[in-house]
Amino acid sequence: MMGSTLLRILVSLVLSLAIAARAYKHKSLNRSGAMMGFVVMAIHIAAGYRFGVLILVFFFTSSKLTKFGQEKKRTIDEDFKEGGQRNWIQVLANSAIATVLVVILVTITGGEDRCLDTKNSALITGLTGGVIGHYACCNGDTWSSEIGMLSKGQPRLITTFKPVKKGTNGAVTIEGLLAAAAAGFVIGLAYTLVGLLTTGCAGDVAWKQLLVVPIATAMGLCGSLIDSLLGATVQFSGYCSLRKKVVSKRAPSVTKISGMNILDNNGVNAASILLTTLLTSVACLYIF
């Protein structure tokens, strides 16, 4: 047991360092983002391979989608940066809650992967469900945003269904919503496949682990909808006549589209992640 734990810690350090360095080289993360990314990834992988695969699937798929169609996104996104270049605040906004949960879990389990089973441990089931929901939300929101910006469909504000310009906070498209569900599906599938190799679930408990896939799919969509609802109501969107873009800050040249200036994009992301994490945790307690 001690040997496998030490091996996992070593793997976590080497793999996280390699991924963070590569991400910095390819401009997926800036310097501060790469440093924070290394810490967060190392914690997840050291806590359990299932948790490690969740953050890695989220990171790699979101990074690829961020770079897809960059020329078009450059004309839409006010904060566009070549390659994405997420900083430490963005990394933390998309990983802080899950990092806290996996640290609690590894403290309880000693790094042993456990099945989702409330009869054995409701606490472990609830906390693990929260981690799954966290990354289903993160992946769903990212896929939805990145694919939605490239959609040929007309974005509509989620609160009024009024047609709005691309880049408006709280706007949704059919393609974006389907992408969110697909993103959640990928998270659930990755967790389940790795779990088959790392857990000793048996009987009905083993079969029930497959329910993670539809749960994560639903939470990918749900998390994206929550993010859009918050974006449309507590995050300001306006059209700048000078930059010819939708922006998130008031100015003399900006005409309001929607939302109050209460939270910025990182705040909206963190709030939607927290709500989806709690929702998934409760769902897992009832289902498993």
State where each predicted segment sits:
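Hydrophobic alpha-helical transmembrane segments
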Residues: 1-288
